[in-house]
UniProtKB/Swiss-Prot annotation:
Lineage: Bacteria, Bacillati, Bacillota, Bacilli, Lactobacillales
Purpose of the protein: Binds 23S rRNA and is also seen to make contacts with the A and possibly P site tRNAs.
Keywords recorded for this protein, A-Z: Ribonucleoprotein, Ribosomal protein, RNA-binding, rRNA-binding, tRNA-binding
Name used for this protein in its record: Large ribosomal subunit protein uL16
Pfam entry (one): Ribosomal_L16
Protein family according to the UniProt entry: Belongs to the universal ribosomal protein uL16 family.
Organism: Streptococcus equi subsp. zooepidemicus (strain MGCS10565)
Subunit annotation: Part of the 50S ribosomal subunit.
Amino acid sequence: MLVPKRVKHRREFRGKMRGEAKGGKEVSFGEYGLQATTSSWITNRQIEAARIAMTRYMKRGGKVWIKIFPHKSYTAKAIGVRMGSGKGAPEGWVAPVKRGKVMFEVAGVSEEIAREALRLASHKLPVKCKFVKREAE
């Protein structure tokens, strides 16, 4: 699973998820991509589940690029603990994804296979997604 090797601060602020993604809105490496149409946090487990769903459907054919990385930690307190007494312990890692960001890219397979593989991957993610193609240059 994807986790940072080392971080400066273990506990981060949650931050805001306003507006569209600034960069990474076009398909740059592969031929086809999966673009987020809503914003959300995507955990490292969800990214891994989507990757497995894609590669299994493509039967090891083609190439997959993961263009998001879970660099933000999130914390949680144990169930049954009252409010206060500081921030909870680090629970996991998330990738903040804004709308418009291309999260996964695929190349080396036909459009039908890529479309179905990315559709299966989108069912593993908490954001609404759409299939996008690389624009002709």
